[in-house]
Design a protein with these regions (language model features):
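Active-site and NAD+-binding cores of ADP-ribose-processing enzymes
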Residues: 138-225
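Extended, helix-rich architectural segments
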Residues: 1-166, 174-175
């Protein structure tokens, strides 16, 4: 479950087309996380002055969320590679290629501790109403898979089709030991005229850019998946 450093609101305000609604939603989600961690307040309704009623906190929500997450993903889902619908009969070469690809996928999931991450993501989704799955490809680190909790990303869809994502931005806070200050990494995808662009920047706590990791660059994607 998410224990990440808080992302400054200013970064969301700069990216959101409706920051007031987004920040109100975030405030509600923060309250949900507080209830999950600390329990919900409960006070006796008895107004008698003969005694001081006990103030109790119950963690029923946390117990239910933990049990439901384990129930859903104690056994991880099977990941299968299927051929294109247009292929009527697989050749031996096709079957070999599919087997190798499935082996590669299983290896990537294992290296990313997919089973553990999936249970944590389920808890984040139950609490924060949504999570994002992000796959990154890097020459140094290979293929990495991450689940991003609600308080670390935003997305916006097309006015004409809510199934089309036009913007997706996610953030990751970290501590810069050289600067002795918190930094925030931002990765932004935008869909413009059928082309997906990506940009990466690093910001200080006030939202100012301290480093451009990747200038806005077109990708080979025609949609934000």
């Amino acid at each position: 479950m998410s224990t990440a450093l808080e992302i400054p609101d200013i970064l969301f305000i700069e990216e959101s087309s409706n920051p007031t609604a987004l920040l109100a939603d975030f405030q509600e989600i923060r309250k949900f996380y507080e209830i999950y961690r600390e329990g919900a307040d409960w006070k006796s309704a008895d107004e008698t002055k003969d005694f001081t009623p006990a103030e109790l906190r119950f963690k029923i929500s946390a117990s239910l969320i933990n049990k439901q997450a384990r129930f859903l993903f104690a056994e991880p889902p099977d990941i299968l590679v299927e051929p294109n619908d247009g292929i009527d009969k697989l050749t031996e070469a096709d079957e070999t290629a599919i087997s190798r690809l499935e082996s590669l996928v299983r290896s990537i999931l294992y290296e990313n501790r997919f089973e553990e991450a999936l249970i944590k993501a389920a808890k984040d989704c139950f609490i924060g109403k949504r999570v994002a799955g992000v796959v990154n490809f890097d020459e140094e680190h290979g293929v990495t898979l991450s689940f991003i909790p609600a308080l670390q990303f935003l997305f916006e869809t097309s006015f004409y089709n809510s199934n089309v994502i036009e913007k997706f931005v996610y953030f990751r806070a970290f501590f810069d030991s050289d600067a002795k200050e918190k930094r925030v990494y931002k990765k932004k995808y935008t869909l413009e005229e059928g082309i997906v662009f990506v940009a990466e920047t690093i910001h200080d706590p006030s939202g100012d850019i301290v480093e451009v990791v990747l200038e806005k660059t077109p990708t080979l994607l025609a949609a934000i998946p």
